[in-house]
Regions:
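Conserved beta-strand positions in repeat-built beta-propeller and related beta-rich domains
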Residues: 31-32, 37-42, 78-83, 123-131, ...
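A short beta-strand motif characteristic of beta-propeller blades
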Residues: 13-19, 55-61, 96-103, 145-151
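A short loop-to-beta-strand structural motif that recurs across blades of beta-propeller domains
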Residues: 46-48, 84-86, 135-138
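Bacterial Sec-dependent signal peptides at the C-terminal "C-region" and cleavage site
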Residues: 1-7
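Intrinsically disordered, low-complexity, positively charged segments
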Residues: 19-53
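Short loop/turn segments that connect beta-strands within beta-propeller blades
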Residues: 51-55, 89-93, 140-144
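Beta-rich, blade/repeat-based domains predominating
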Residues: 20-34, 63-78, 104-120, 149-167
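Glycine/small-residue-rich loop that forms an oxyanion/phosphate-binding "nest" at active or ligand-binding sites
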Residues: 77-116, 127, 131
Length: 167
């Protein structure tokens, strides 16, 4: 009798696709319309887009930390900068503000975020150095309305929805 309840897992070798050398690389997400992979380097203040067909990588550098990216259209993504949600035009890198995020006088920054099935961006803040309870979880509507959902959050991370669209 087997004592393991785990299904058999096929182990396949991993291959490095791109040497980003990120300081804090996070938030990878597939862009279904562009067929590319996006991720951010939070401390490096950079947004990356990897093109698997050509094995090339595009990047956009910002003047503040960038902590999350979500696809919007085939030519735009929404990102969370340190204290602001912005739309990035992927053709020219131009940004437009969607909504400011309260930064508690420079004591917190945006961290992880994802869009829910209704199109609202859920994004959390965290204190520099991750002090307990310094952050807040917000939603940002497509119109840019910011709503506080949960206070005294330490780190919002790994925000996802289940297949039945529950948080």
């Amino acid at each position: 009798m087997s004592t393991s309840c785990s299904p058999k897992v096929e182990i396949i070798p991993a291959e490095l696709a791109y040497q980003a050398e990120a300081t804090t690389g996070e938030g990878s997400i597939w862009h279904p319309e562009r067929h590319t992979l996006f991720w951010v380097d939070i401390e490096g203040q950079t947004l990356y887009e990897y093109h698997p067909d050509t094995k090339e990588c595009s990047s956009w550098k910002f003047d503040r930390m960038v902590s999350t990216v979500v696809p919007e259209t085939d030519s735009t993504v929404i990102i969370a900068l340190q204290n602001e949600i912005v739309r990035v035009n992927l053709h020219d890198g131009h940004t437009t503000s969607v909504a400011p995020i309260p930064d508690e006088n420079g004591k917190v920054r945006c961290n992880d975020g994802k869009c829910d099935p209704a199109g609202h961006l859920w994004v959390g803040t965290m204190g520099f150095g991750a002090p307990k309870g310094a952050g807040t979880l917000y939603t940002v509507s497509p119109a840019g309305t910011v709503t506080t959902k949960l206070k005294k959050v330490t780190i919002s991370n790994g925000i996802v929805w289940s297949s039945n669209k529950k948080f």
